[in-house]
Amino acid sequence: MQAEILLTLKLQQRLFADPRRIALLKQIQHTGSISQGAKLAGISYKSAWDAINDMNTLSEEILVERATGGKGGGGAHLTRYGERLIQLYDLLATIQQKAFDTLKDDSLPLDSLLAAISRFSLQTSARNQFFGTLIERDHQQVQQHVNILLSDGKTRLTAAITQQSADRLQLSAGKEVLALIKAPWVKLVTDPALAGAADNALPGTVASIEPGNDHSEVIVTLTGGANLCSTQNNSELHALNLRVGSAVIAQFNADRVIIATLC
């Protein structure tokens, strides 16, 4: 759904940038002239001059440098700061549209900034991406363990992370995090006695099996409702005798969990 979202930036409670002013800056950048830029942007020369004065006055740095007089009203060019403003404005406009598009995804919690940003801007090769809240950090030296409660409110994960990384991510109880787990790192077992062989052992039910030549993809619905993907060697999968509806335990160690968050 393409929405018309008009981005307006204000500084000191005064208009700094809007679609018309950004269009003017782009035309000045293209033509090297305020008068030609104004004409192509569909505004008068006086309005263009006033807009540039306003932006240059409000901004911490000059956006447009100009030379008065001369043919066509004098030359002008954007400073590096002005060029970056255009880039930032276009970036914000893209983010606004992508954010609006998340309205169509009813499964996405819009009360989570991390979940929203990750969904429309973050692409990773990890098949398993779980949103959750950090509930505990052990503060050991060098390597630490953190416990994460997933957004289903039931499933808990343990992740291993270096002390330096935990400090850099500013991990503390209550912080929203994204846990990434690659599918080959997830092993499946059916014997509950083997559940203690890994740091994380999540019970669930086989939802689907996609066979391949050497490996197969197994989707497991966890007891909390989240889906987890595992790729299994076909010989191992055959030994487990899995089928849709089979009860399984998904296992992976804490050092196989990658943590991402907003700082």
From Swiss-Prot:
DNA-binding region extent: 33-79
Q: Encoded by which gene?
A: modE
Q: Name one GO cellular component term.
A: cytoplasm
Similarity remark = Belongs to the ModE family.
Gene3D superfamilies per record: 2.40.50.100, Winged helix-like DNA-binding domain superfamily/Winged helix DNA-binding domain
Signal sequence span per UniProt? none
Matching entries from Pfam families are given as:
TOBE
Superkingdom of the source?
Bacteria
Q: Which segments carry the region annotation I?
A: 1-120
List the keywords (alphabetical): Activator, Cytoplasm, DNA-binding, Molybdenum, Repeat, Repressor, Transcription, Transcription regulation, Transport
**Segments for region (Required for dimer formation and molybdate binding):** 124-132
What GO terms in the biological process aspect are recorded for it? molybdate ion transport; regulation of DNA-templated transcription
Which Gene Ontology molecular function entries are recorded, alphabetically? cis-regulatory region sequence-specific DNA binding; molybdenum ion binding
Q: Where in the cell is it found?
A: Cytoplasm
What job does the chain carry out?
The ModE-Mo complex acts as a repressor of the modABC operon, involved in the transport of molybdate. Upon binding molybdate, the conformation of the protein changes, promoting dimerization of ModE-Mo. The protein dimer is then competent to bind a DNA region, upstream of the modABC operon. Also acts as an enhancer of the expression of genes coding for molybdoenzymes, both directly and indirectly.
Q: What is this protein called?
A: Transcriptional regulator ModE
**InterPro entries registered for this protein in UniProt:** Mo/tungstate-bd_C_term_dom, ModE, ModE-bd_N, Molybdate_resp_trans_reg, Mop_domain, Transp-assoc_OB_typ1, WH-like_DNA-bd_sf, WH_DNA-bd_sf
Domain spans labelled Mop: 123-190, 195-261
Listed under subunit, the entry gives: Homodimer.
